Amino acid sequence: MSRHRKPARGLADRLVTAGLELVLTAGALVLLFVVYQAYVTDWFADQRQDQVAEDLRDEWQDGPPAEPALGEAFLFLHIPRFGDDWNRAVLEGVDPDELSTGPGHYPDSALPGEIGNFALAGHRVGLGSPFLDNDKLGPGDPVVVETADTWFVYRVTGSEIVDPTDTSVVDYPLAGEREGAWLTMTTCHPKFSNRERLVTHALLDSAVAKADEPQGPALLAAGE
């Protein structure tokens, strides 16, 4: 009898061991994916972001910019809450190609300073993670948009969590809000998930010509 039990126990042990190995392998693969998504894609996106930012600055030196085409950078976004040197070049379009380089502008939404809803999208984690800390923005926080000739200062009014299919957040007028020049930023929520969308709204507070303030509003240097 004992000679028949030992093989049974050995088979059970092998099955348990194989199961544990599968679990460990799956865990390692998940960890590698997280590292790749959070760090490796960030590195590549940062290289692309640096290049388009440099190209945009050079373009502005050459003369008045043309109407942006899909995939082209056409302005800079500054968010002092993330650091006084935090800025990202924003591209026209919100397809994967654009968002793999930086924040993108919803093509059918308003432009900076216009009455309407100037709407942007950006990744939360990975591919540059431009909107990683958007959940830290609160009412009154400034969001500065830099174009070739103007600085626009928006002030955050609030945020909301919505379903990914809710596109009304980038429409105009915004539900329950007064008319004006609005800025909306959308990103995934929570971190490491695209189950929902974190939406941040801001209202235009002021605008100043770059000819009058070449270095930008004082709040940029102050890191307000």
Q: What does each of the following model-derived ranges do?
A:
Residues 1-12:
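N-terminal Lys/Arg-rich, disordered targeting/topogenic segments
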Residues 11-12, 17-18, 23-224:
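Solvent-exposed, non-transmembrane regions of membrane-associated and secreted proteins
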